[in-house]
Amino acid sequence: MSLTLAAHGAYALSFIIDILGAGGAKPPEIAVAMSSACARHRCRSMTAVPSGSAFWRFSLGFYRQGGVAEACIRLQDQDGVDVNLLLFLLWQAVGGRVLSERDIEELERRIAPWRNATVIPLRTVRRALKPAPGLVPAPAAELFRIKIKATELEAERLQQEAMDELARSSPYGRKVSSIEEAARGNLACYAMVCQTSFPEPEIAILLAALGSPEPKLEE
């Protein structure tokens, strides 16, 4: 899901090389080359990361399962969910832990300053660049957007690493025997904290993904 900051320069350079590899291509062909390069580099960005925390590794595998990304984004945009907190609650459910509303409110209080200062502003800029405003040539604007996205994902990785440390230093919630019970309990409590109810189709997608084997992470 992310690039390390040290990898950003190499990532951007290899992206440029991919585009320049189109040689003397005309504008429409350059657009096709850019689209292909974006797809390739999105896949690389999902794996070109250090192994990180157990939570981060869970997130990498879980988020790539079918329908999960779309469900998370819908919950984010429609219900005000912090996707990293949502993933944290599902990761805790895998360990059989059910968090209370107070636990989730405490987590929200701890992570909100970082999220509001970094993740949300970067997301706003990234989304504003698709499609990019005029003035700057489209290839340059798209490369800039990709660099913003890499930085946004790095901000999310740092948030997750901090959340993992919080969970290890002071475990949250109570233990139950069923992953589904824990997941449903955590989602229900988070919905109450958000003062909403999560749509059942999104819940079903997330629960189904929890019951699927985690995709093998590339070394």
Give residue ranges: language-model regions.
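Short amphipathic alpha-helical segments and their helix-coil junctions
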Residues: 15, 55-76
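Extreme N-terminal basic, low-complexity initiation segments
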Residues: 1-11
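A charged, amphipathic interaction segment
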Residues: 129-209
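Short, hydrophobic/amphipathic alpha-helical patches that form generic packing surfaces
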Residues: 14, 84-94, 150, 164-165, ...
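N-terminal interaction modules that seed assembly of large macromolecular complexes
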Residues: 69-112
